[in-house]
Amino acid sequence: MLVMIIEHFRNGDPKPVYARFRERGRLAPEGLKYVSSWVTDDLARCYQVMECEDRSLLDQWMAAWSDIVEFEVIPIVTSAEAAKRAS
């Protein structure tokens, strides 16, 4: 399962997020794969693609950040998969 995670940094402040990342890493449990991410120019939001087979791994990861990040989770598919489904 691929998911697009939209992270809204609490109070629009990325500093606590990047400080924790430097200190503790991504905090992703075994089985949750980071694919890639992009951050808005104003550093208020991050768009991140993650992959896992077990939704509870994603929930565990989000719980480790939920005090400083608000999350939106959107299931996604690749363009190739979308084309196949649309045929």
Please report, for each region that a protein language model flagged, where it lies by residue.
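Conserved short beta-strand edge segments in small beta-sheet-based binding/regulatory domains
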Residues: I68-S79
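Short S/T/G/P-rich N-terminal loop/turn motif that feeds into the first structured element of a domain
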Residues: M1-V35, V39-R45, E53-L57, V77-S87
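Conserved catalytic core of Hanks-type protein kinase domains
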Residues: E51-C52, A64
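Short, electropositive alpha-helical surface patch
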Residues: L58-W65
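A short local loop/turn or secondary-structure capping micro-motif enriched for an aromatic residue
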Residues: D13-P14, D67-V69
